Amino acid sequence: MGSIEIPNCSGSIVYKTISDFIDFPNHEQKLWWHSTAPMFAEMLRVAGYDLHSQYKILGIFLNHVIPFLGVYPTRINNRWLSILTRYGTPFELSLNCSQSLVRYTYEPINSATGTVKDPFNTHSIWDALDRLMPLQKGIDLEFFKHLKQDLTVDDQDSAYLLENNLVGGQIRTQNKLALDLKGGNFVLKTYIYPALKALATGKSIKTLMFDSVYRLCRQNPSLEAPLRALEEYVDSKGPNSTASPRLLSCDLIDPSKSRVKIYILELNVTLEAMEDLWTMGGRLNDASTLAGLEMLRELWDLIKLPPGMREYPEPFLQLGTIPDEQLPLMANYTLHHDQAMPEPQVYFTTFGLNDGRIADGLVTFFERRGWNHMAQTYKDSLRAY
């Protein structure tokens, strides 16, 4: 009788070769490497990165990112809980299927994170940036410095929050970094969560975010038109809306080329709500948007998100538990220079749903698009991961 070979990403030659030569500075970093690098290496291979790029990317990850992931998560250890995943882990890999582009996101953590020196992890991101900037030409921190100053807490804010016991179960992540991997190079991005700043100042997240970007527009007026259009859409939904701004991001490149993205969380998980996010309540009605709307409806039919009102759950899930929850919808709006309207992107939040059923729906969608290689390899890749 024949046997079925189940793919296993731990067999990656690149991962094994690098592993043979590592002298880990501590056990935590060793655990991080061996639990993340096999999947990372396999994703790079499947996405078509050449061998030289695979080694370079994994080398940067090993030497300049893993040192900022903190203690390796277990069920019993005391660790910083990151908003990046529902399990509080500070690292996540993702794949842009249509462009075969791998990305990873992480919340930088250091020895001061969560201590009296840095109770809300405000400062460790600077050390992480110091490690990354010499590795890639073109990194520019102008937008980041502006937004971080406006939207994350300083030491005075931190003291106020602690003295008045205002944080409680509030998620404490304030900023994280992402690397879009293009060949052996990367484009660096940041994500900023103003929830703690809102607590410290008494201002809404929406007010903080939009006011900060408007101030950014004083030196970059080409971003103002799409920002005003987005604000008008958000305000039109009224004070009792189920949709609200949650975070923003920007590219850490030349300000004249950097994009700002504003993210909206929608608690009402319905096709109608997602259509409203995609078209900005009918404000976007060009041919490209309408074509995307048809694809959105097709995906909704294939994935079958259970409808209903979904609050963002608290607290974090314990490692190893099977999720029995569904997350709200989310959309982001990219502000491009010299464009009148923002560009939407919507997220199908499938966390907590059956992976096999979701994979079947995606394979069907890939086949209909003519993405034959992705359709043929997607399930095997998931099994390998």
UniProtKB/Swiss-Prot annotation:
What keywords is this UniProt entry annotated with? Alkaloid metabolism, Transferase
Entry GO MF terms: tryptophan dimethylallyltransferase activity
Which residues are noted in the entry as substrate-binding?
A: 103, 189, 191, 259, 261, 263, 345, 347
Pathway noted in the entry: Alkaloid biosynthesis; ergot alkaloid biosynthesis
Pfam families, per this entry?
A: Trp_DMAT (PF11991)
The EC number on file is 2.5.1.34
Question: Is NAD there in the keyword field?
Answer: no
Q: Does the keyword Transferase apply?
A: yes
Cross-referenced InterPro entries: Aro_prenylTrfase, Aro_prenylTrfase_DMATS
One BP term from GO: indole alkaloid biosynthetic process
From the UniProt record, list the reaction(s) this protein catalyses.
L-tryptophan + dimethylallyl diphosphate = 4-(3-methylbut-2-enyl)-L-tryptophan + diphosphate
Sequence positions that bind L-tryptophan: 83-84, 92, 193, 246
Which domain of life does this protein belong to? Eukaryota
Q: What quaternary arrangement does the UniProt entry report?
A: Homodimer.
> Which family does the record assign?
Belongs to the tryptophan dimethylallyltransferase family.
Function of this protein? Tryptophan dimethylallyltransferase; part of the gene cluster that mediates the biosynthesis of fungal ergot alkaloid. DmaW catalyzes the first step of ergot alkaloid biosynthesis by condensing dimethylallyl diphosphate (DMAP) and tryptophan to form 4-dimethylallyl-L-tryptophan. The second step is catalyzed by the methyltransferase easF that methylates 4-dimethylallyl-L-tryptophan in the presence of S-adenosyl-L-methionine, resulting in the formation of 4-dimethylallyl-L-abrine.
Protein name in the entry? Tryptophan dimethylallyltransferase
Question: Species name for this entry?
Answer: Arthroderma benhamiae (strain ATCC MYA-4681 / CBS 112371)
